[in-house]
Amino acid sequence: MKKIVFLMLALSGFAFAAEGSMNQWLASFSILAAGLGLGVAALGGAIGMGNTAAATIAGTARNPGLGGKLMTTMFIALAMIEAQVIYALVIALIALYANPFQALVAA
């Protein structure tokens, strides 16, 4: 509780600072959100890819005759998983360089 109160008191100086500081806050939170969002997306993608590969290896071990079909399906699934991470990267780049919230701060 003491840490939260100290943090709020420490940040209150920034809240009453000059008008131009809002752009700095927006930039810093955009960088934080982009990094955090991309990190979570990459973590989820890595877990999904690991589960996909494990399931494909287990399926091939059970029935070696289906190995080719399982590999094809696995590559399609991996491409779909990786596409989600690339979408997160695009959103992070938009938040960093073409920030749509810039107009709200200027108003």
From Swiss-Prot:
| SUPFAM superfamilies in alphabetical order | F1F0 ATP synthase subunit C
- Locate the transmembrane regions by residue number: 4-24, 29-49, 74-94
Description of how the protein assembles with itself and partners: F-type ATPases have 2 components, F(1) - the catalytic core - and F(0) - the membrane proton channel. F(1) has five subunits: alpha(3), beta(3), gamma(1), delta(1), epsilon(1). F(0) has three main subunits: a(1), b(2) and c(10-14). The alpha and beta chains form an alternating ring which encloses part of the gamma chain. F(1) is attached to F(0) by a central stalk formed by the gamma and epsilon chains, while a peripheral stalk is formed by the delta and b chains.
Does the keyword Cell membrane belong to this entry? yes
Question: What's this protein's function?
Answer: F(1)F(0) ATP synthase produces ATP from ADP in the presence of a proton or sodium gradient. F-type ATPases consist of two structural domains, F(1) containing the extramembraneous catalytic core and F(0) containing the membrane proton channel, linked together by a central stalk and a peripheral stalk. During catalysis, ATP synthesis in the catalytic domain of F(1) is coupled via a rotary mechanism of the central stalk subunits to proton translocation. Key component of the F(0) channel; it plays a direct role in translocation across the membrane. A homomeric c-ring of between 10-14 subunits forms the central stalk rotor element with the F(1) delta and epsilon subunits.
Name of the protein in question: ATP synthase subunit c
Q: Which InterPro entries match?
A: ATP_synth_csu_bac/chlpt, ATP_synth_F0_csu, ATP_synth_F0_csu_DDCD_BS, ATP_synth_F0_csu_sf, ATPase_proteolipid_c-like_dom, F/V-ATP_Csub_sf
- Source domain of life: Bacteria
Keyword flag Ion transport: yes
Where does the record place it?
Answer: Cell inner membrane
* Keyword terms of this UniProt record: ATP synthesis, Cell inner membrane, Cell membrane, CF(0), Hydrogen ion transport, Ion transport, Lipid-binding, Membrane, Transmembrane, Transmembrane helix, Transport
Instruction: Identify its protein family.
Output: Belongs to the ATPase C chain family.
The protein's predominant localisation is: membrane
Any Gene Ontology CC annotation: proton-transporting two-sector ATPase complex, proton-transporting domain
Question: Site described as Reversibly protonated during proton transport, positions?
Answer: E82
Q: What taxonomic ancestry is recorded?
A: Bacteria, Pseudomonadati, Campylobacterota, Epsilonproteobacteria, Campylobacterales
Q: Which organism is it from?
A: Campylobacter lari (strain RM2100 / D67 / ATCC BAA-1060)
List, in alphabetical order, the Gene Ontology terms for molecular function in this entry. Answer: lipid binding; proton-transporting ATP synthase activity, rotational mechanism
Its placement in the membrane is given as: Multi-pass membrane protein
